[in-house]
Design a protein with these regions (language model features):
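Non-catalytic cap/lid and distal C-terminal segments of serine-dependent acyl enzymes
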Residues: 1-124
């Protein structure tokens, strides 16, 4: 149940951003749609990477220390295709990130390696 709720929440954020906020900005400003970049740090980085699986709008996506340890995110990426095949992607995670937390954060380096490999495989 939590998995569906979390996925629905991420989808709502992307829907709000790409279906409501972006069109509103485009109606007010001259925006080059070939230069839309979506990125973030920590949970924002996870959301940006998640968007690769949900929309092809951003021309580039970046994640700095993305929270790829988030429950079921690695499985989500394994089970779903990247939709945004043309995006430039930049991922940056520390190799010792979270290792002294003694909880789910301990898995951060391994999860990051898996996400990096999955995206690399799907985009090449």
């Amino acid at each position: 149940m939590r998995k569906q709720s979390d996925q629905a929440q991420k989808t709502l954020v992307d829907n709000e951003l790409f279906n409501n906020v972006l069109p509103e900005l485009q109606s007010r400003y001259s925006i080059d749609t070939n230069k839309i970049i979506y990125g973030g740090y920590s949970l924002g980085g996870l959301a940006a990477v998640y968007s690769l699986y949900r929309t092809n709008i951003p021309s580039a996506v970046f994640s700095i220390c993305g929270s790829f340890w988030y429950p079921e995110f690695v499985n989500f990426c394994k089970e779903n295709p990247v939709i945004n095949q043309n995006a430039s992607v930049y991922l940056c995670n520390g190799k010792t990130e979270g290792i002294h937390h003694h909880n789910i954060l301990d898995t951060a380096p391994q999860c990051a390696e898996k996400i990096h490999a999955l995206i690399r495989k799907q985009l090449n």
